[in-house]
Amino acid sequence: MNLVAVGVNHTTADVELRERLAFSTQQAEVALASLREMPGVREAALLSTCNRTELYCLTDDVTPNFAQWLASSRNLSVERLSTVLYQHTGEQALEHMMRVAGGLDSLVLGEPQILGQMREAYARAHEAGLLNGELSRLFQEVFSVAKRIRTETGIGANPVSVAYAAVSFARHIFADLKKSRALLIGAGEMIELVARHLSEQQVQEITIANRTQERASELAAAVGGRGISLEELPVALERADILISCTAAPLPIMGKGMVERALKKRRHRPMFMVDIAVPRDIEPEVGELGDVYLYTVDHLQEAIQENVRSRQQAAQEASELIRDAIVRHRRQRREQDAVKVLRDYREQRKAMAESELEKALQQLRNGGDAEQVLRRFQHSLVNKWLHSPSVTLRKMAADGRAEALLLARELLLDDDQS
C-alpha cells in the first residue's frame, strides 16, 4: 500500500480557487462517503481550512486519480486544478503531513490552529469508517511529532496567527487602536483569537455578531465587549471602524449595499475590513467603495512577515525533529518488514514440521520403532527445511553473487557453534 497526500494551499492557489475547493463540515462528510467507494482507496481523511484543502490516503499500488475526483466534486476542470495541485507519496507524504501539523507549511509560520484542524479531520474520517489501520497509526505519528514541535522548540513563543496578523495589519492602518471600535463576525476559534488580540491592544469597543447571539455574548463577555445577532449587523456596522469576519457561511453575509448605507450614516469615515473566511463573508465589490479598505487572507502576508523572522530558528529545529521522526519511521517500517518475513518463515516451517510430525506419529501408532521413527523424522524435516535455501544458494553461487552468499552465511549460520 502507498501513502498519498494531495491538495492545494495558499502558496499554489489564490483565494478564489481555494473558495471553490473548500469543504464545509457537511460537504466533507459527503466527500468522505464518496472516497470510501473510490476504487483503490483503503483509508482516507480530508482536511479543509481557509488556506488549504488536502487529502491523505492509503491506496493500493496503483494510485487513484485524485485530481479528477477533486475536480468533479467541486465542479472544476482538471486542467485548471492540475496547475495548482501538488501530490506527495510515501515518506514525502508523511513528512508533508508532519510539516502541516507542526505549522511549518502554514501562511503564518508555526500557527497552532492547524493541529486542531487536522485532529478534527482525523476524527471525521474515523467516524466515517475511513481510518481503520495503517493511516490511523501514521496520523498518531504525525500528532506526536507536532506536539514535540510545540513543546520543544520556540515556534510558539511569540503568538502569531492569521488572527494576530489581521490585528497587526489594523495597527498599521490606525495610529491608535484605543480610539477605534471593532466589529467581529463569527464565534469560532479564529474570532476568539482576534477578540483577545484586540483586547490586548485596548481597542475602545468590541462587538461580536453571530448567528447564535448566546455564543456571541459568551465570547464578548471574556473581552469586555457585547454580543449581538446577525440581524443587528446593519446598525452595528455604522459604529465599526474595524471589521473582521470569519464565519462558516456558504454565501457572503455582507453586501455592497449594506456597507454603502453604513458609510452614509458614518459620514464616510473610513472602515478597515479583513475577511478571513473561505468562502468569503464580504462581497468583493465592497472593496470598490472609496472609504473602505478591504483585505482578505491573501493580503495579510506582509504583516505576517514581521513575526516570521523570529521563528526561523525554531522552524529549523522543528525540521530536525521531523527528519528524525522520518528516520525512526523508516527504521520501524524496515523492522516491520523483517517481522513479516520472519512470521511467514515461521508459519511455513511450522506447517512443514506439523506435516512430518503427523507422519512420525502415525508410524508410532502403527508400531514402528521409536528411535528409527524419530531419526527419519529428523532427517526428513532437515531436508525439507533446507531444500528451498539450497536451491537458492546454488543459483547465487552460479551467478557469482558473493555478497549474497556472505549474507546467507550471516543469516543461516551461528559461527559460535561452527
Curated annotation (Swiss-Prot):
Keyword annotations: NADP, Oxidoreductase, Porphyrin biosynthesis
Cross-referenced CDD domains: NAD_bind_Glutamyl_tRNA_reduct
GO molecular function, one term: glutamyl-tRNA reductase activity
Catalytic residue positions: C50 (nucleophile)
Positions bearing the site annotation: Important for activity: H96
Ligand binding (NADP(+)): G186, A187, G188, E189, M190, I191
Catalyzed reactions per annotation: (S)-4-amino-5-oxopentanoate + tRNA(Glu) + NADP(+) = L-glutamyl-tRNA(Glu) + NADPH + H(+)
Family indicated by similarity: Belongs to the glutamyl-tRNA reductase family.
Miscellaneous section: During catalysis, the active site Cys acts as a nucleophile attacking the alpha-carbonyl group of tRNA-bound glutamate with the formation of a thioester intermediate between enzyme and glutamate, and the concomitant release of tRNA(Glu). The thioester intermediate is finally reduced by direct hydride transfer from NADPH, to form the product GSA.
PANTHER family recorded: GLUTAMYL-TRNA REDUCTASE
Official protein name in the record: Glutamyl-tRNA reductase
Protein species of origin: Alcanivorax borkumensis (strain ATCC 700651 / DSM 11573 / NCIMB 13689 / SK2)
Record lineage: Bacteria, Pseudomonadati, Pseudomonadota, Gammaproteobacteria, Oceanospirillales
